[in-house]
């Protein structure tokens, strides 16, 4: 039976009640539950919706909390509490004196998630499905916006009698956090924006994302010795691929992130989706240059695999309690700027879009066309083309509100091409007491699940002291391990360098180098794998298990034709340490190898020891 605890909430005609529920994995002093709030705050006695929260208690209960960390997830549409493990992990070093509050924004997670039938499957025709979703939601869609969500946050703080908070927002959570800061500056002790963009929104044609994609291509290639773009501009390498698939799409079957054979049609629209995925999947920056070279030479499998891992295809959609596509649309179609005027009838919007795009300078969307960049079928710039304009105006923050002098930390990866560093710079200029940290070689959101013990350490120091402290680690994060080539035989693989006691042949060391790349390829696929098993690029399979210490098991995994890798590799996520024990067969060669390298050291080397047909092998190579 649930208990009701009366508590005060701002701007309410009657004190609302918290309905308590059991806390998932909670401690004795944790509080979880729901707060009922009006759908439309102009009608406090009208329809109510539930806002779900989890208040995780500090360890030291002998005195009041030093503060409460309020963590808000992005999307829009993702559930904050579904991501509790990562947020608790980030908060843990602060947990002696500070509480942690997680809140699912309205329409997400357990806060009565929006669930349009049109989005229960991934199918083409996104704009039409969005229009059907708008009709299904009816006029209620206008009340699922950022302004209402931050007022919900304030209501939860009031109901729980929480004092000033250290607000952490990532991705869209950082957008909502800015809106909260502008509306409730007195409720903030500090503000951290991770992977951020400006209010009311970025360029409606996503031109800034195109610019950051070009920048990302150049940065990823320029920082890695042996990048296959060579002396050619990396953007031109991809531009050549764009021209090819625009003229002649590449069609075939390749494994997705879980190893499921997937039919792929790689045209310009699909390639836009591939490149837009770089913000979360480093395999895009890692593979794209070598995959483009291979496709040009007639080997399309690496490119088709990359597309199968990133391009949205037909199939069941995920649980809306984890991510609500319907809520995503309700928010962006209400809050973000568009390529058409709000007063333009739906039927006239395409003409207005064409005129707006024609005004952009040539090359704005390079290496893609304006039509492909803005018209991609999944969450593109035209997602709201047939969504009705809001019947009410409720901007994310009060018009004319001054940016507060609250201590503000802004974290952004320079390979983030969904909330670009340029946008974070604009936001930093708006907050008078802000520090912007550019985390090199990092994608979208840097402190959560931080592999490099950098952004998370800066965050913890900032919350503790209101100063970011030493931020020099942000310029030392490891480069993207760009694949030098997708070779078709071991003879085409550059050999590992022989050590002092080595008695192996050049072919032995080519095979050893191939084995190291095979392990690295599987480790990279972990980021897009959800069921613990996968397949090799050229055959065989692998699986993994574990948490911070992950064990990968290889069964004749083939990254290069003719080379089969079996054995195990262990990866410690928090330290980046990789250790492998492998049996490798390549033609008549049998190798027993031990290898080790780090994923957290820039320009790291991999050490390889073992035997090749009885010959001692001691070599090293640039860590893959």
Give residue ranges: language-model regions.
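Signal peptide processing junction and immediate N-terminal pro/mature segment
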Residues: 1-9
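Gly/Pro-rich cap/lid or specificity-loop segments adjacent to the active site
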Residues: 10-270, 336, 340-624
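Alpha/beta-hydrolase-fold enzymes
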Residues: 222-332, 336-337
